[in-house]
Amino acid sequence: MDNPARKQRGAEKTARIPIKIVPAERLKKPDWIRIRLGAGAEAERFNEIKQTLREHKLHTVCEEASCPNIHECFGKGTATFMIMGDICTRRCPFCDVGHGRPEPLNPNEPTDLARTIAAMRLNYVVITSVDRDDLRDGGAQHFVDCIRETRAASPSTTIEVLVPDFRGRMEIALEIFNQAPPDVMNHNMETVPRLYKQARPGADYAYSLRLLKEFKAGHPDVLTKSGLMVGLGETDDEILDVMRDLRAHDVDMLTIGQYLQPSGGHLPVLRYVHPDTFKMFETEALRMGFRNAACGPMVRSSYWADQQAHGAGVV
C-alpha cells in the first residue's frame, strides 16, 4: 500500500496513473544528445551553488527533475529555484520530481529565497514549483510572496515564474498574481493534446491555454511563455498545431526540447528529433509571430532563460 507521506519516484510514482506505461525498445541516443559535465572553475562553481542551496534549505528543479543541463547551468552560476517543497501532488510519468503528500509551506521560504538570490547576485532568476493541489490557491500567494521578497532584496533582478496549472483555482490564482506580477509568466503545455491523458494525468490542454491567455489579458505588458517536449509519440504536425494554439492565445515565447527518459519507470522515448527539425520549429515559430523561440535537443523551459528573455526584449 502507498504511503502518501513518503516521496515516491520512478515506477513507484507512476504505478497508479490511469493509462499505464507501455514499455518500448530503448532507442540508442544519437550523437547530438550530449550531456555536458563541468570541469575546472565551472566544476567549482557547480559545487558552490549546491552548497549555497543546501545551506539555505532550497530546492532546484535542476536537481529534482534530473535536468541534463545542471552542470552547465550551475557552472555558470544560474539555477531555477523550486519553491513549496520537493514533493508534487501529481504523477506525471515524464517527470522525475517525487510524488506524495507535501509538507506544509515554509513561511520563511520567500525571505530565504530572496537572500540567496541576492547573495548569488543573479541578474535573472526563474522560480518554479511542484503542483500543490492540496492548497486552496494552488500556491499562488506563495509565488507572489517570493516575487515581492526577491524584488525588495534585488530590485534589478528580472523574475520569471514557471507555474503549475492551478487546477480548479485559476481565477483565485490570477487575482492573487495581480498583487505582484512577474516579468515573465511561463506555463508549459508539455505535449500535444492527443497525449495529455498519458503524459499529463490530471491536466487539461484547453485549461492550460486559457491560463496563459487570461493572465496575458490582465497583464498585456508581461511576456508569456510556454514549453513543449518532443519524443513522446507526437508528430511534427501536431507540434506545429500546438504552436498555432499558443499564438492564438497570445503567448510570446516558446521552448521546444527533446524528452529524455529519467528511468525505466517513466514514459519511453519514442523518437529522437533531428536538429534540423528543431531548426524548422524555430523558423516556423518566428514566422507565426513568437517574439523568441528556443528549439533544440537540449533546450529546457528555463535553459538560458535570461538569454531568451533578452532576445524577446525583457532584459
From Swiss-Prot:
Q: Which InterPro entries match?
A: Aldolase_TIM, Elp3/MiaA/NifB-like_rSAM, LIAS_N, Lipoyl_synth, rSAM
> What keywords appear on the UniProt entry?
4Fe-4S, Cytoplasm, Iron, Iron-sulfur, Metal-binding, S-adenosyl-L-methionine, Transferase
Has UniProt tagged this entry with the keyword Acetylation?
no
Binding residues for [4Fe-4S] cluster 1: 62, 67, 73, 302
Q: Where do transmembrane segments lie in this chain? A: none
One annotated GO molecular function = 4 iron, 4 sulfur cluster binding
Q: Which cofactor does it need?
A: [4Fe-4S] cluster
What's the catalysed reaction? Answer: [[Fe-S] cluster scaffold protein carrying a second [4Fe-4S](2+) cluster] + N(6)-octanoyl-L-lysyl-[protein] + 2 oxidized [2Fe-2S]-[ferredoxin] + 2 S-adenosyl-L-methionine + 4 H(+) = [[Fe-S] cluster scaffold protein] + N(6)-[(R)-dihydrolipoyl]-L-lysyl-[protein] + 4 Fe(3+) + 2 hydrogen sulfide + 2 5'-deoxyadenosine + 2 L-methionine + 2 reduced [2Fe-2S]-[ferredoxin]
Give its localization. Answer: Cytoplasm
* Radical SAM core domain residues: 74-291
Please give the family membership noted in the entry: Belongs to the radical SAM superfamily. Lipoyl synthase family.
PANTHER family in alphabetical order: LIPOYL SYNTHASE, LIPOYL SYNTHASE, MITOCHONDRIAL
Q: What is this protein called?
A: Lipoyl synthase
Give the lineage.
Answer: Bacteria, Pseudomonadati, Pseudomonadota, Betaproteobacteria, Rhodocyclales
Gene name per UniProt: lipA
